[in-house]
């Protein structure tokens, strides 16, 4: 048990260093927060974070995406025009596809936890090295589900 603790801590430290070296605040902060939680009595909250963290993250992301509508930065006129421009219609179609893939990804990650480690490593590498954003595991899992037929 103690050996597993140290292995997981080392992995988090490596992720923290990768985040620092790549100047990626999301990876750096996430790894740092998880290290603090892991080495303090806050670790009792890991089951809650594991059960609800993904949904909370999606909620926060959705709030961020909808904020331009709520603040008025994206006008009603712009929203209506998005239904008549070819580029916007393609964007809507891609948004639908990505949301569908994300849904498949959540199901796959829940039903086949053995793929989660690979998806996370790929996502963290993409975030740290390619300056991506950490929405990758859901989409990657959705794409994987298409390839493996799940």
UniProtKB/Swiss-Prot annotation:
Entry's HAMAP family? Answer: UPF0756
Q: Indicate whether Lyase appears among the record's keywords.
A: no
Entry's PANTHER family? UPF0756 MEMBRANE PROTEIN YEAL
Q: Where are the transmembrane segments?
A: 1-21, 45-65, 83-103, 115-135
| Keywords associated with the record | Cell membrane, Membrane, Transmembrane, Transmembrane helix
DNA damage: is it a keyword of this entry?
no
Q: Which InterPro entries match?
A: UPF0756_TM
Designated name of the protein:
UPF0756 membrane protein ACICU_02320
Q: Organism's domain of life?
A: Bacteria
Q: Name one GO cellular component term.
A: plasma membrane
How does the entry describe its membrane topology? Multi-pass membrane protein
Family, per the entry? Belongs to the UPF0756 family.
Q: Where in the cell is it found?
A: Cell membrane
Query: Which residues are the signal sequence here?
Result: none
């Amino acid at each position: 048990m103690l050996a597993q603790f140290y292995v997981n801590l080392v992995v988090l430290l490596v992720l923290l260093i990768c985040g620092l070296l790549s100047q990626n605040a999301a990876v750096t902060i996430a790894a740092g927060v998880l290290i603090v939680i892991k080495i303090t009595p806050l670790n009792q909250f890991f089951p809650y974070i594991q059960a609800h963290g993904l949904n909370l993250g999606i909620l926060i992301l959705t709030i961020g995406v909808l904020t331009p509508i709520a603040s008025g930065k994206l006008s009603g006129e712009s929203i209506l025009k998005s239904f008549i421009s070819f580029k916007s219609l393609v964007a809507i179609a891609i948004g639908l596809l990505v949301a569908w893939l994300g849904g498949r990804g959540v199901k796959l990650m829940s039903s086949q936890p053995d793929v989660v480690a690979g998806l996370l490593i790929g996502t963290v590498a993409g975030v740290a090295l390619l300056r991506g954003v950490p929405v990758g595991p859901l989409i990657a899992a959705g794409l994987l589900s298409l390839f493996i037929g799940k």
